[in-house]
Design a protein with these regions (language model features):
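Beta-strand-rich binding/interaction modules
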Residues: 79-90, 123-125, 493-513
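Hydrophobic faces of well-ordered beta-strands that scaffold small-molecule active sites
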Residues: 152-156, 194-196, 231-235, 284-288, ...
Length: 532
């Protein structure tokens, strides 16, 4: 049966090649050689016959840059077999194809292309037995690092790549190489904050009042800071039964042991040693626990408030310039969170906290309502700062949603936004995989481009104000290099408005220039208007 399928596929390929000759502009030309420089591996066949990728260190390229695709024949069993190679991009309206015959003596089949259009470019490989492979390449300008006016963050799980083994590393790369490539990719986007959650207290201290091992955290802090980014440290999670408060020892369940409130004396010893070790590190954001109003903390609100105040006091006493904020609250708009916001307001007024954390993961159908409900609570609590949205993505992480959520988070006065999450891992059951905008090989999807576009236009811009804050029409105004930038988007239905007056250039959510007519449709796909 397989031979029959292959026979018919060869015929189909031959027919397609004939018609392709009539339209040479849509064809791909290949070079086959026995020698190739090392290339970034974007995948390989399960049977080890093929490897494929791009020449370079990451999967992101500048507009107009020549990109070389490499397809390597790794086994003589492919000798003489034919394959169809396709290159497609929705943003660039490209659909090209070509054909190769595998040659064991010249195992590297390569082609090059370039494009001035930002977007995702997908290379597909189809064999005569109908087996298919594909990978994505992103084209977008390399961004300047976002400045400190707003934190554009990611949660890339570099700790897992460094410590948890092959299932969490990039395929074909060791732990250190994986960390470097992850951060190089983040650096290309211009993000200025990395949030990590996988180095808990128990990984650093093995016994009460014992020595603290900073090896992994030193690596993380140094690597992130070397890339010009701040490090969001989630300071929390107890270290095992020996570290929990006495009242919880009889009911201690090891499967959720890290969620119990700690013995405060033992905990504060750990915090003190940590604060002393990083006393000169002002590029760390200290987030005290994660979702203390949810399953990550088994204690009462009052137990968290005590932990929060005492921990913040230790940190601020060590260095008053430390940036400290309360743990991001799950389901941030719930009225039951009011006491948490009130405690944050109290500690901000005491100069023990700089801000409060919250998590709004919702999709665009609820984002506007839930954000404004949360802001009503924070206003009622007396908070004078806008918070840090230190996790956002689970309820919606497609290209338009990530862009709109980042935009609206800043529009409502926050100081930071962390897109959750950054990358998939090889381990399929990993809970981050459904929300990532890079896959396990760091191949980007559309959301990577749109998030980078937010940073491209606004990462070094000053927020001037919100012109319209209606669900179906949000207009934000920024200023960058003396130029006004207005961003139009909707968190609800489409709205048609008159096109802006004046001389300007408009861009779509991928950063590609677009023409405007007398009216524009404002949707959940942001439009950036840059005045000349």
């Amino acid at each position: 049966m397989t031979q029959l399928i292959s026979f018919f596929m060869v015929i189909i390929f031959a027919i397609e090649m004939f018609f392709m000759g009539l339209f040479p502009s849509d064809s791909i030309s290949f070079t086959q050689t026995d020698n190739s420089d090392s290339f970034y591996v974007n995948g390989e066949s399960e049977n080890g016959l093929l490897r494929y990728g791009v020449a370079g260190d990451i999967n992101l390229f500048e507009p107009g840059e020549e990109i070389t695709v490499v397809i390597e024949c790794c086994d003589n069993n492919l000798e003489g077999e034919q394959a169809k190679i396709s290159l497609k991009s929705e943003q660039a309206d490209i659909n090209k194809r070509g054909y190769i015959v595998f040659d064991a003596d010249n195992p590297y089949s390569m082609f090059s292309f370039s494009s001035d259009i930002n977007g995702i470019y997908t290379v597909s490989i189809e064999l005569t037995d109908r087996t298919k492979y594909s990978f994505n390449i992103g084209i977008l300008p390399r961004n300047e690092k976002a400045d400190d006016d707003f934190l554009y963050g990611i949660q890339p799980y570099i700790t897992r790549a460094y410590c948890w083994g092959e299932g969490f590393q990039l395929p074909n790369y060791n732990a250190e190489e994986s960390v470097n490539r992850i951060l190089d990719t983040a650096d290309y986007l211009g993000v200025n904050l990395v949030r990590e959650d996988s180095v808990g207290w128990g990984a650093m201290q093995r016994e009460a009042f014992g020595a603290v091992d900073f090896t992994v955290q030193d690596m993380l802090v140094n690597k992130v800071n070397e890339h010009g980014m701040k490090y969001n440290w989630i300071l929390g999670f107890n270290a095992g039964e020996w570290s929990v408060a006495d009242k919880y020892k009889d009911s201690y369940d090891e499967s959720t042991g890290w969620t119990y409130p700690p013995n405060e004396e033992i905990w504060l010893d750990f915090v003190t040693k940590t604060a002393e070790h990083y006393s000169d590190s002002t590029d760390i954001l200290w987030e005290i626990w994660n979702e203390p109003n949810w399953d990550f903390f088994k204690g009462s609100p009052e137990e968290y408030f005590s932990l929060l105040e005492k921990t913040a006091t230790v940190l601020k006493n060590q260095n008053h310039e430390f940036y400290v904020f309360s743990g991001g609250l799950a389901v941030a708009q719930k009225e039951s969170n009011l006491p948490f916001y009130q405690k944050s307001a109290e500690l901000i007024n005491k100069n023990l906290l700089n801000n409060f954390g919250y998590h709004n993961h919702d999709g665009l159908d609820n984002y506007y309502d839930y954000m404004n409900a949360m802001l009503g609570l924070t206003d009622n609590a007396g908070l004078s700062v806008g918070g840090i949205n230190s996790e956002s993505g689970v309820g919606g992480s497609d290209a338009a949603t990530i862009a709109c959520k980042a935009l609206y988070t800043r529009s409502t006065g926050a100081e930071g936004f962390v897109s959750f999450s950054f990358r998939k891992t090889v381990t399929p059951e990993n809970d981050v995989n459904n929300f990532a905008f890079f896959n396990e090989y760091l191949q980007p999807d559309d959301a990577a481009i749109t998030y980078a576009t937010v940073i491209r236009f606004l990462g070094n811009a000053e927020f001037k104000g919100n012109i319209s804050n209606e669900r179906n029409l949000i207009i934000d105004e920024y200023e960058k290099d003396g130029k006004t930038i207005k961003v139009y988007y909707s968190l609800g239905d489409t709205t048609k408005i008159s096109a802006p007056d004046g001389s300007y250039t408009a861009y779509d959510m991928y950063g590609n220039e677009i023409k405007t007519e007398k009216t524009i449709k404002v949707t959940n796909e942001p439009i950036y208007v840059v005045y000349n």
